[in-house]
Regions:
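Charged docking surfaces used in two-component/phosphorelay signaling
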Residues: 14-22
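Short hydrophobic/Thr-rich beta-strand motif most characteristic of the beta2 strand and flanking loop
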Residues: 24-31, 39, 101
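Active-site beta3 strand of CheY-like receiver
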Residues: 43-49
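Receiver (REC) domain active-site loop signature in two-component systems and cognate sites
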Residues: 54
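C-terminal output helix
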Residues: 105-114
Length: 119
């Protein structure tokens, strides 16, 4: 399974990449929305984790662009955020996210979400 992790935090990217690699995933990382959009067409991930708070192109905008592309509209997107408010979760749903994972998350929480989308 190919999973993309989009986060401006190197620590989050590396942590998620390590956990998912150990679970048999091919992981593609991106530092922001622009980086992600340039890699999505080539890598065609099966699942995308996107941080909300990023410079240049935030997670909401990135998710909306992914979901509005017919080729990737069916690709599950999980939003990552340190914000746990109803407004933030609702905004994620409006732009098309499938799920919301609040940081800091545990390895078990990450794997629980991952397993829901595993092919």
């Amino acid at each position: 399974m190919k999973v993309m992790v989009v986060d401006d935090s190197n620590t989050i990217r590396k942590t998620v990449e390590t956990i998912l690699n150990k679970n048999g995933c091919e992981v593609i990382t991106a530092v922001d929305g622009y980086d992600a959009l340039s890699k999505i067409a080539d890598s065609k991930p099966d699942l995308i984790f996107i941080d909300i708070m990023m410079p240049r192109l935030d997670g909401y905008q990135t998710c909306a662009l992914v979901k509005n592309n017919p080729e990737f509209s069916g690709t599950p997107v999980v939003m990552l955020s340190s914000k746990d408010g109803l407004f933030d979760k609702a905004k994620g749903r409006i732009v098309g996210s499938d799920q919301y994972l609040t940081k800091p998350f545990s390895k078990d929480e990450l794997l629980e979400v991952f397993e829901q989308y595993r092919a």
